[in-house]
């Protein structure tokens, strides 16, 4: 029996996504289970924009694996950052947005600087509270300012999906689907993956509530 809390809102009962399945929308958006230490889904590599909110330290990362009922294969947080960087290099996007916190800011910023010639750092908040400080680190091929300064990260994601030009956006830590919701509302394609099937089921459910219809490719 699974621990109470790991099932989130219970969407997994209605949308029991499993390894090897891809949930697909009419516009080509896709969601699948994937652990970045084992590789990205091929469809994720077609995105030209990336937004991710990775674990902030080794303890948080280990907790994510525990909630997904998996063993954490990463020995250090620096190793985790290397996996993230490798994924971004495979995608080779035009733009990258990484949400970070005080505990991982000093590792995220140098990573983005190593990937893009132009880096901008926005001061942001989360959970709509000024007490909750975070940053969105933006990497691009030329200087850009998308007006994200001071915004809550939730609102910033919706603004990015609405205003930033891209063919498809990917989030390989999709979780419960903020990027998917924002892209869907903006009428754009998203590619989402996460190692936790229960969290992905919530994302799938949220798109259904917005009118989306999924087909399953096994």
Language-model region placement:
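Class I S-adenosyl-L-methionine-dependent methyltransferase catalytic core
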Residues: 1-218
């Amino acid at each position: 029996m699974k621990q109470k809390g790991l099932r989130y809102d219970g969407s997994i009962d209605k949308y029991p996504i499993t390894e090897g399945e891809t949930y697909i929308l009419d516009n080509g958006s896709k969601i699948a289970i994937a652990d970045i230490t084992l590789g990205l889904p091929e469809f994720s590599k077609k995105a030209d924009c990336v937004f991710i909110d990775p674990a902030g330290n080794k303890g948080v990362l280990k907790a994510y694996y525990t909630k997904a009922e998996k063993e954490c294969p990463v020995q250090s947080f620096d190793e985790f950052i290397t996996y993230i960087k490798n994924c971004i290099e495979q995608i080779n996007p035009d733009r990258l947005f990484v949400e970070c916190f005080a505990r991982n800011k000093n590792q995220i910023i140098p990573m983005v600087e190593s990937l893009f010639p132009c880096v901008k750092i926005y001061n942001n908040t989360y959970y709509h509270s000024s007490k909750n400080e975070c940053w969105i680190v933006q990497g691009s091929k030329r200087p850009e300012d998308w007006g994200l300064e001071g915004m809550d990260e939730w609102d910033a994601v919706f603004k990015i999906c609405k205003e930033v030009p891209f063919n498809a956006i990917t989030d390989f830590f999709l979780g419960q689907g903020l990027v998917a919701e924002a892209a869907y509302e903006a009428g754009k394609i998203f590619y989402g993956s996460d190692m936790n099937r229960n969290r992905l089921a919530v994302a799938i459910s949220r798109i259904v509530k917005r009118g989306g219809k999924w087909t399953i490719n096994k």
